[in-house]
Amino acid sequence: MATEATGAVEAAPGMPQLDFSTFPNQIFWLIITLVAIYLILTKVALPRIGSVLAERSGTITNDLAAAEELKLAAVEAEKAYNQALADARAEAQKIVAEARAEIQADLDVATAKADAEIAAKSAEAEKAIAEIREGAMASVTEVATDTAQALVAALLPSAKDADVSAAVAERVKG
């Protein structure tokens, strides 16, 4: 019997799927298979896929909200940083100005003190120079008088020392 069925199949021309005598049987199994696939998809696979998609959507939404909050916090932190930086710069400029004023005041005091010391030393030096000049002039006058007296005594032995001294003093004065 198996050989007869095999022989009939071999004798039939064309593809067995296109044999119209087996269409009702193939359509029945096609419907059963499609219904089984539909039930498996609707009861098992699609709910899992839907839950994964919903979870992903929730995660993305939460992440976007967190990112927006962090962005706002970063903007606020940047504003606070810029304000603190501006305050620090202003404070630094204030400190620099105070330090400059203090240094200038110290410099003015030191300059005034140095000027006073220089003026005092200058007065002392001028006094010493005047004393040295007077001493030098006295020495010059004395040397000139002695020299003149020696010369006059050699040339005119009868000349008086007082007259020679008076003549030298008058000549030295100018």
Swiss-Prot record:
Task: State any single GO MF term.
Answer: proton-transporting ATPase activity, rotational mechanism
The family classification in the record reads: Belongs to the ATPase B chain family.
* Example of a GO cellular component annotation carried by this entry: plasma membrane
Its annotated compartments are: Cell inner membrane
The record, for InterPro entries, names:
ATP_synth_b/b'su_bac/chlpt, ATP_synthase_B_chain
Keywords, in A-Z order: ATP synthesis, Cell inner membrane, Cell membrane, CF(0), Hydrogen ion transport, Ion transport, Membrane, Transmembrane, Transmembrane helix, Transport
Q: How does it assemble?
A: F-type ATPases have 2 components, F(1) - the catalytic core - and F(0) - the membrane proton channel. F(1) has five subunits: alpha(3), beta(3), gamma(1), delta(1), epsilon(1). F(0) has three main subunits: a(1), b(2) and c(10-14). The alpha and beta chains form an alternating ring which encloses part of the gamma chain. F(1) is attached to F(0) by a central stalk formed by the gamma and epsilon chains, while a peripheral stalk is formed by the delta and b chains.
Q: Which protein is depicted? A: ATP synthase subunit b 2
Per the entry, what this protein does is:
F(1)F(0) ATP synthase produces ATP from ADP in the presence of a proton or sodium gradient. F-type ATPases consist of two structural domains, F(1) containing the extramembraneous catalytic core and F(0) containing the membrane proton channel, linked together by a central stalk and a peripheral stalk. During catalysis, ATP synthesis in the catalytic domain of F(1) is coupled via a rotary mechanism of the central stalk subunits to proton translocation. Component of the F(0) channel, it forms part of the peripheral stalk, linking F(1) to F(0). The b'-subunit is a diverged and duplicated form of b found in plants and photosynthetic bacteria.
**Name of one Pfam family that matches:** ATP-synt_B
List all membrane-crossing ranges: 27-47
Protein topology in the membrane: Single-pass membrane protein
Q: Which gene encodes it?
A: atpF2
Does the keyword Cell inner membrane belong to this entry?
yes
